[in-house]
Amino acid sequence: VLATRGYGEANSTPAGGQGAGEAVSRASKHDWGGKDYRELMTCVDTASRLFSLGEKRWGVMGGSYGGFLTNWIIGHTDRFSCAVAERSTCNRYSQAGTSDCAFRYGEYEFDGLPWDHPDHYLAHSPITYVRSIHTPLLLIHGDEDMNCPISQSEEMFSALRLLHKEVYFARFPGQSHGMSARGTPNCRLDRYRLLLWWMDRYLDREGTAEAEKEEQDV
């Protein structure tokens, strides 16, 4: 969909990602926002060099673990003109008690429960770095997401609004963690419309007739 608007995409499977083998999937254990973040920035550096892209011509987006990384990235660099975090998390401590994974997932990832290692959980939570965020952020979340509860986006949205940062929160009623692939047709179409509106708004400042019409409709 983004390609139809003239955007290129740089995709990567960093440490912690799936589809490149167990070693890669396990490589971010204990260190969410560490090696994975560095590898993604290397991908951006390489693509920028190969295609002569300026610093202000980049957006960043991701869902689930990629949504976590999006929230993390914009708290650690200002190189992106806009960001989209879908079904994301921002607070590893609070997520541990609200996700359908319960406490076991965090116990595996961080070798202990939140109250055993509170500093470690918060050090690897994007919400901790919210004051450093200057990138406009679009949050997309289904309110029946049990894996990454919508309260995670609510936390991020509330914090950014409190700090007078630029943020937009799209809440999709009745949609689960898999909305982008298995959601109702109208919600999936609305999601695409939001993505294009947000990217056009910040990556194409001059705008187009289509972008201007969509902004009026949002």
PLM regions: where:
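Active-site-proximal cap/loop segments of hydrolase catalytic domains
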Residues: V1-R5, E9-V218
